[in-house]
Amino acid sequence: LFLSLAMVASALSFVSCNKTKQVKVGVSMPTKSLQRWNQDGDNMKKELEAAGYFVDLQYANNDIAQQTSQIENMLTQGDSILVIAAIDGSALKGVLDTAKKQGVKVIAYDRLIMNSDAVTYYATFDNYKVGTIQGTYLVDNLKLKERTADDPAYIELFTGSPDDNNIHFFFGGAVDVLKPYFDSGVLVCPSGQTSEAQCATLNWSTEAVQKRMENLIAAQGYGPAGKKLDAVYSSNDSVAQGITNALVAAGYTAANFPLVTGQDCDKPSVKNMIAGTQAMSVFKDTRTLASQVVKMVDAIAKGSEPPINDTKTYDNGTGIIPSFLCEPVYGDKSNYKSLLIDSGYYKASDIE
């Protein structure tokens, strides 16, 4: 009897010890206003909890001060690992200095956090490849290799938020592919707005993009019966949706719609691809990225090295950040069913 009681006491003590040692993971997402961040947050929370971690998931409404405050609270509450998709990649140094002093490990999620040596690892997609996929699509479908400067294709360019480090890779990858055709006169941007700064959109705002596209249409005289516009480069889907809204309002239809690129395969953009008002999107399966982060968290919690496949690309100003890059995939009207529906990413009813 005494032996049995001792065994029970020992078991209870073990369970209690396990509970007190449960690792707390803080997950800080930038906003709930974009579909992809909801999916990222939900996927991570579900997988981390299934792996036995306590998860504190917070969304910051694209408010830098709010995100900073939420991270401060995570540190106060004893979170020992932070996963952060920063609103502004350069705005978190102060709070992350505190994290480093407390021995908290920091994983930058999809957006690299700049100028902080507290960042331990980075998990993202191959963002340069995202841009090259978009650029290559335009080269192929505008038939730029077959054109001459006497018959150029006309394009306007849009990218994302200037405080998001990823735009250097999205935009840079696309421009690297397109630059030879700009240089030879085979590809022309009538507005002359081709620099990253000129094409950037604060907070990836659909509304701001729509306004800029409307202004370009008015200034350049674009339209089905007006000046020719063959394509609009867009770094992601929230940007593409603003472009599409403006072009539809200007009278374009699926029969004469300029080629509009995108990224994320957001539901509205998939619907636009089906309708012929967006040409393509780069699919980044957030389930894959979330699963990779869970592996990284698990390795950190167990004191081992997490899986890394890039130690050259991402320098945040304090040095190269060891990274894991997931593969982006091309998507359009021809393959969205196998890519998104058959894989279980969406239900068919989501995009009907």
Please place each PLM-identified region on the residue numbering.
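A residue-level marker of the well-folded mature domains of exported/periplasmic proteins
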Residues: 17-352
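Sec-dependent N-terminal signal peptides of Gram-positive bacterial secreted proteins and lipoproteins
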Residues: 1-17
